[in-house]
Regions:
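Metal-ion/cofactor- or nucleotide/acyl-coenzyme-handling active-site neighborhoods
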Residues: 1-180
Length: 180
């Protein structure tokens, strides 16, 4: 059976969610308020948890990762309260410290991915998640498909630098580009 998850969280007004990573900005974030917030939390990778498995500062409602399951603590996979989204090729991955495979875990969905340009990032004609080799981009695509339209990011520290060709194109179109 296929689950009907498209726009599951959509509302009349733009629906918000927290997108929680484990980058340095989480250290200065009001994690207690975020954790207590009724807004859905989408966890990415360690989602506020250290690689040593220390307790998460924010327990996600939804979780995803591009990386192998062996990198993450078993409590994420075995918790039925956390809805997990994993690439289809991870179904048979072993869960650390157990004899379970990812396909044995509760509340776990597997998806197929595809490579497509960022111009087609939100292509509703595609039934696959964008394969950008990046968990954050994957989480954005999953969140958008679930119906979220406003993302509050914490611990999501990354910088995307445009290529020289992209900067040249922007400048030729009259766009003032500032690298700071």
């Amino acid at each position: 059976a296929t689950a009907a998850l498209e726009n599951l969280y959509a509302g009349n007004d733009p629906t918000a969610c927290w997108l929680v990573g484990s980058g340095p900005s989480i250290l200065g974030a009001p994690v207690e308020q975020i954790a207590a917030s009724p807004v859905v939390k989408i966890g990415v990778n360690f989602s506020g948890r250290g690689p040593d498995g220390t307790a998460p500062r924010i327990t996600p409602d939804i979780w995803t990762s591009f990386d192998p399951t062996s990198r993450f603590h078993r409590s994420i996979f075995l918790n039925p309260r956390i809805t997990k989204f994993l690439k289809a090729d991870k179904q048979k991955d072993l869960i650390p410290g157990t004899t379970f495979k990812a396909c044995d875990c509760p509340a776990t969905y597997f998806f197929r991915s595809e490579t497509r340009g960022y111009g087609d990032f939100l292509d509703s004609r595609s039934d696959r998640i964008l394969n950008a080799l990046d968990s954050f981009i994957q989480a954005l695509d999953i969140g958008y498909r679930l119906g979220f339209r406003r993302f509050f990011c914490v611990g999501a520290d990354f910088i995307i630098r445009p290529s020289d060709a992209q900067v040249s194109l922007a400048v030729s179109c009259g766009i003032d580009f500032d690298e700071t």
